[in-house]
Regions:
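Short beta-strand/turn micro-motifs at beta-sheet edges
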Residues: 23-27, 77-80
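Acidic/histidine-rich, surface-exposed loop or edge segments in extracytoplasmic proteins
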Residues: 29-44, 89
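N-terminal, post-signal-peptide region of Sec/Tat-exported proteins
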Residues: 42-90
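Short, solvent-exposed mixed-charge patches
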Residues: 146-147
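An amphipathic, aromatic/His-enriched active-site/gating alpha helix that lines ligand/cofactor pockets
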Residues: 25-28, 59, 63-71, 86, ...
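Bacterial N-terminal signal peptides
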Residues: 7-20
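Hydrophobic pocket/interface hotspot
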Residues: 37, 49, 91, 101
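Positively charged n-region of N-terminal signal peptides that target proteins for export
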Residues: 1-4
């Protein structure tokens, strides 16, 4: 019975270690992970949105960058909307790997609450932001390079 349990444990360990090896592609190398958020900012509110990004997003994500949780962040605009509710601003956040996303999720709340002054102030700012912008979609993508 002990041999069977030992064998099962070893098999489980080999499967756990071997899984990443199987996940490697012969076609590309894995790169960083990107989260892209597509936002629709209401007409006439774009300046308020950009000011919010400058006052809140940038200082927080610059600190996250210092902490090593993100590699970079970028903003994109959509010059050709397909319909009135289409996105007009996209925010892209680059993470070194999936693990840094988990690490950041666990630790960033403290920094975020400190920036806003309190948890309630953070919630109030999010409610205010929701008055002039809507998150259309949030996507995760792994950057890859061809071999």
């Amino acid at each position: 019975m002990r041999k069977m349990v030992l064998w099962l444990c070893l098999t489980a360990m080999l499967l756990a270690v071997g899984t990443p090896l199987v996940a490697q592609s012969p076609n590309f190398n894995n790169g960083p992970v990107w989260r892209v958020m597509y936002v629709n900012v209401k007409t006439g509110m774009i300046d308020q949105y950009w000011n919010d990004l400058k006052q809140n997003f940038r200082p927080l994500y610059d600190e996250y960058k210092k902490q090593g949780w993100i590699v970079d962040y970028k903003f994109y605009t959509n010059p050709v909307a397909e319909h009135p509710d289409d996105w007009n601003v996209a925010l892209a956040i680059e993470y070194k790997n999936w693990g840094t996303m988990d690490e950041m999720a666990e630790k960033a709340t403290t920094i975020t609450e400190k920036h806003y002054g309190s948890h309630q102030a953070m919630v109030d700012a999010a409610k205010k932001r929701a008055e002039y912008s809507t998150l259309i979609r949030s996507s995760l993508a792994r950057e890859v390079t061809l071999k």
